[in-house]
């Protein structure tokens, strides 16, 4: 294993006149492409059982996004109030209590029964399915607060996956032009934390950097060299677990100001990268960073046990 020293990002900033601030989740492709990426990454990986399990989880997400009727959209007046006050228009606290969200949860839990899974994961799902209203509301609240109890991570994984469906559906229905920056590391659509950031190669935004919400999958434009935990543009460096750091497609962006780090993916170098799937598959980078003074700032409910 070769570890590169902390150094400035060697990549050249793309020549984009003005990248769009927000890229909304594409429901037709989001979860389907992610599932395919999980499956591809599982081939030959020592994480294959878990990656294949998450591929199954993501296939269910894709199926439900296609099968379920659209959710009640966020009211236009709420969007405008949120815009005026620099707040996200999706109410995370209220989202889990809506009837259409509860339908998503129920159908997701039912479909997850058929997944091949370890005994502990099967037991956790059974307990989630039979949870009373108070317990389910508590778990939804934890997921929406990005605060998952260590003793019940497996239970919360299922709830988080179901809530990702509902959040992405709501975010996809927003008018992206009405979203505004909130503050560093906060999704402008739902207020969630980023799982990581990505330098993209999409037409019209080549070389631009986007943070990706761990909940609703909205992507928002950020300065290329900037800490997404504290906002500092000083003391930023990069580490990788690959030979030839300049060619690495997944790196740790570290900040000496707040001693945090977050993954940055170079989709412009590898178009098949998925921010969630490749976050999980690059667990070796997390293990490397555990031996440093930096604390992970990216949030991923699928990686909370590591």
UniProtKB/Swiss-Prot annotation:
Main location: cytoplasm
InterPro entries noted in UniProt: FdhE-like_sf, FdhE_C, FdhE_central, FdhE_N, Formate_DH_accessory
Pfam families per UniProt: FdhE_C, FdhE_central, FdhE_N
Keyword Cytoplasm part of the UniProt annotation: yes
GO biological process terms held by the UniProt record: protein maturation
Gene Ontology CC terms, in alphabetical order: cytosol
CDD domains in the record: FdhE
Intracellular or extracellular location(s): Cytoplasm
Keywords tagged on the record: Cytoplasm, Plasmid
Keyword rRNA-binding: no
Molecular function via GO: ferric iron binding
Role this protein plays: Necessary for formate dehydrogenase activity.
Family of this protein: Belongs to the FdhE family.
NCBIfam families cross-referenced by the UniProt entry: FdhE
Name of protein: Protein FdhE homolog
